[in-house]
From Swiss-Prot:
Chain span(s) of sequence motif 'KMSKS' region: 252-256
Pfam families listed in its UniProt record: Anticodon_2, tRNA-synt_1c
Gene that this sequence comes from: gltX1
Protein name listed in UniProt: Glutamate--tRNA ligase 1
Family annotation (SUPFAM superfamilies): An anticodon-binding domain of class I aminoacyl-tRNA synthetases (SSF48163), Nucleotidylyl transferase (SSF52374)
């Protein structure tokens, strides 16, 4: 490790959005490719919405994806504590320092006064900003407000007519004027809790963070933070703002585009290495443009300079294709183990012994290479777990085609007389019955397939019939025969 330090600082207020996970991933890849220290910090100052359950979920999702951190709440380091709720005294100390140096002040404005100021600014056609009403209060005025029961916030003084410039590692030079920042900003709320822009500067400075890598939705926070860095005499880190991920309609990725939380993909049976691979390619690509890469290969090839500024599109079809490649390369045992919870939730299985497990391996192996995500198995392999299959209008037409009844009755009779149904037995049987009935090809196979599966396509009959078992096959053949007019 060298002196480079990066951090991922989520709030434990809900499930982790895909965009936040991509931010964590870029910080992780930077740390591992550059030999930097990767810090996990929990920003839990929103006491009402923060919870330990969501904090545990953050750990779980990062670990599932294979993102390891070097310092954090569970991995003490030299710059802890790593939860903001445990650092309140530190923030108060620096807020007081700013007040003493006349760089911040207590503000007693009521919400009604602030709303009235905002309304008047809008009426004038101005950008709403704090008026600075409390910047120069006398001691007597402050005491009067306190007697009224007003609880102050602490505001940081935003200088007038200052130009803040910084070199973004992804977007290049960014220039923002101080008069667009909304006026003197609140850094400590009336309940004593620090605001995001204040706490994040204190934490990043004291934790020696050298590179702040985050989403571009933070760009307008950066000049405010730079002003606080300067006011406190802290060294300013390098900033990188990754482009936001868009949905297929090129608007910001949201719930209307489908699943937007990493946990939803984990629960559906997407593989962590596929998600790691896919997310790494949202705004970054290796020089050789290879798409399927292991975690180790991505780390080896990762170069921060190859992150581009254009907004990437979250292409679910691309993710499904990529996940399918990883499923195909996985062992059947791994996919069965991932499928079992889905099959249980569907009510298809209960207890599992070695015989059932081996049967599941045989069933799932029929579909494994075609799965885009593991949860699809409950629908694709449904016919193996239900007693009866349903027939659509289209499949009923197939059952009513010429010779169907003859074929189904002959197959039923022979299977009823069989002692054991194996793949070899079924293969020989179907070959023999085509000769006996003089019905061949699709005209022979399709009625059988539809009768026992309810579908007009799928895995080979010679594999399906032994796995379904004699009783199910006979019952379905009987039902189909009775449907034929």
């Amino acid at each position: 490790m060298n002196n480079l330090r990066v951090r991922f600082a989520p709030s434990p207020t809900g499930a982790i959005h895909i965009g936040n996970i991509r931010t964590a991933l870029f910080n992780y890849l930077f740390s591992r490719s550059e030999g930097a220290t990767f810090v996990l910090r929990i920003e839990d100052t929103d006491l009402e919405r923060s919870s330990k359950e969501f904090e545990e979920l953050i750990f779980k999702e990062l670990e599932w994806l294979g993102i390891e951190w070097d310092e954090g709440p569970d991995k003490p380091g030299p710059y802890g504590p790593y939860r903001q709720s445990e650092r309140l005294e530190i923030y108060h100390k620096f807020a007081q320092k700013l007040i003493e140096e006349k760089k911040a002040y207590r503000c007693y404005c009521t919400p009604e006064e602030l709303e009235e100021d905002r309304r008047k600014a809008v009426e004038r056609g101005d950008i709403p900003r704090y008026s600075g009403r409390c910047r120069y209060l006398t001691k007597e005025q402050e005491e009067a407000f306190i007697r009224e029961g007003r609880k102050p916030v602490i505001r940081f003084i935003i200088p007038d007519d200052e130009v803040i410039e910084f070199e973004d590692m992804i977007k290049g030079k960014i220039t923002i004027k101080s008069d667009t920042l909304g006026g003197d900003m609140v850094i400590v709320k009336s309940d004593g809790m620090p605001t995001y822009n204040f706490a994040v500067v204190i934490d990043d400075a004291l934790m020696k963070i050298t590179h702040v890598i985050r989403g571009e939705d933070h760009i307008y926070n950066t000049p405010k933070q730079i002003l606080i860095y300067k006011a406190l005499g802290f060294e300013i880190p390098k900033f990188a703002h990754a482009p936001l991920i868009l949905g297929p309609d090129r608007t910001k990725l949201s719930k209307r585009h489908g699943n937007t939380y990493i946990g939803q993909y984990r629960e559906l049976g997407y593989l962590p290495e596929a998600m790691f691979n896919f997310l790494s390619l949202l705004s970054w690509s290796p020089e050789d443009n290879v798409e399927i890469m292991s975690k180790e290969e991505i780390i080896k090839k990762f170069n921060f300079r190859r992150i581009h500024s254009a907004n990437p599109v979250f292409d679910i079809e691309k993710l499904n294709w990529m996940n399918q490649q990883y499923i195909q390369k996985s062992s059947i045992e791994r996919i069965v183990d991932l499928a079992i919870p889905h099959l249980r939730r569907a009510g298809y299985i209960d207890g599992i012994d070695d015989m059932v497990y081996n049967w599941l391996k045989d069933v799932i192996s029929l579909y494994k290479d075609g799965l885009q995500y593991v949860a699809q198995i409950t629908e694709k392999a449904k016919m193996f777990f239900v007693e009866e299959v349903e027939y659509s209008d289209e499949t009923v037409k197939i059952l009513n085609s010429p010779n169907s009844k003859i074929v189904l009755e002959v197959v039923k009779k022979v299977i009823e007389e069989a002692d054991e149904i194996t793949e070899e037995y079924v293969k020989d049987l179907l070959k023999k019955l085509q000769k006996e009935t003089k019905v061949k090809g699709k005209e022979f196979f399709m009625p059988i397939r539809v009768a026992i599966t309810g579908e007009d396509h799928g895995p080979e009959l010679v594999k399906i019939i032994p796995l379904l078992g004699k009783d199910k096959v006979i019952n379905r053949l009987k039902k189909a025969i009775n449907l034929i007019k």
